[in-house]
Amino acid sequence: MENNLSIVKDNFKELPNNIEAEQAVIGSILVTNEIFDEINTIISNINFYDPMHQKIFSAIENLIYKGMLANPITLKNYFENEKDEINVPEYLVKVTKFSTSSRQAIEYSKIIYDMFVRRELVKISENIIDTA
């Protein structure tokens, strides 16, 4: 039985995600802040798979809730001291190239949420397997 459990766990090493959808949503918000409110009813920062995308979405949220514009220039201060493998200010400019229509960004938000739910189900399944 242990071998079967190992096989199941190996199949779940790559958790469900869609990085392209995450980039498109963030890029779209950075280009058109007006879509944030609708997207924020679907997803929050914890729904993103990529930890950097979680941080970026949180920073966008902070700026927009303060009534400020969220774009690569205004977000630069949030990430100047980040010690990540990527240059976040440059990444923010790059990710705006993935921006899409508001309608598509909303659909991509639903995909991000769906991937989050799937990851949570995988975690629950792994917990059940571990306690079995």
Which functions belong to the PLM regions below?
Residues Y49, T131-A132:
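Short, surface-exposed linear patches
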Residues S125-D130:
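Short, conserved phosphate-binding/catalytic loop or strand-edge motifs used
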